[in-house]
């Protein structure tokens, strides 16, 4: 495969993963508020995959979706969300909250999708309440 084709495949898999995550969130009672939001127009890195309202907890949820073909025995959960990505997510979420004048409760979740389009039922792992300020380079879960 050529590098350009690999990029297209990666983009398609990412879009598929986001669609799977949206479906998952809706089935679990979340209302989708925004998708692929770029609250800072001048900075393409600042993107929020999904913004959803959790009716059960009355809080806004900023969701980062990570799609993998299959689980790796060598990778820990959340490993693909590195320090730079966490920093960009924090900035994007703060910008979204300012732009939408959101003053209520909020949290950050990561949804990991294991599977590929047409490859059967994907495995979905939702990690809630992820802290974007890592301690010693590692993620910390609040709950």
Q: Where on the chain are the PLM-derived regions?
A:
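Interdomain/boundary linker segments immediately adjacent to catalytic/signaling cores
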Residues: 1-23
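Short, conserved glycine- and acidic-residue-centered signature motifs
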Residues: 14, 18, 44, 81-85
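A short acidic/basic microdomain associated with nuclease active sites
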Residues: 26-43
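Short beta-strand or tight-loop elements
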Residues: 29, 46-49, 106
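Protein kinase-like catalytic core scaffold
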Residues: 46, 59-61, 109, 125
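Conserved catalytic cores of phosphodiester-cleaving nucleases, focusing on short active-site segments
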Residues: 48-72, 89
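Catalytic cores of nucleic-acid endonucleases
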Residues: 67-117
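Domain-level recognition of nuclease-like catalytic cores that cleave nucleotide substrates
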Residues: 99-143
């Amino acid at each position: 495969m050529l590098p350009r084709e690999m990029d297209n495949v990666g983009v398609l898999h990412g879009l598929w993963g986001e669609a799977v995550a949206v479906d998952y969130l809706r089935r679990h009672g979340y209302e989708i508020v925004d998708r692929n939001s770029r609250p800072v127009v001048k900075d393409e890195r600042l993107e929020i995959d999904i913004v959803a309202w959790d009716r059960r907890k009355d809080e806004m949820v900023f969701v980062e979706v990570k799609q993998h073909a299959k689980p790796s025995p060598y990778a820990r959960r959340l490993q693909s969300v590195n320090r730079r990505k966490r920093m960009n997510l924090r900035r994007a979420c703060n910008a979204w909250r300012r732009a939408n004048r959101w003053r209520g409760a909020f949290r950050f979740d990561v949804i990991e999708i294991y599977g590929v389009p047409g490859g059967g039922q994907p495995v979905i792992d939702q990690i809630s309440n992820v802290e974007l300020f890592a301690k010693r380079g590692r993620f910390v879960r609040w709950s």
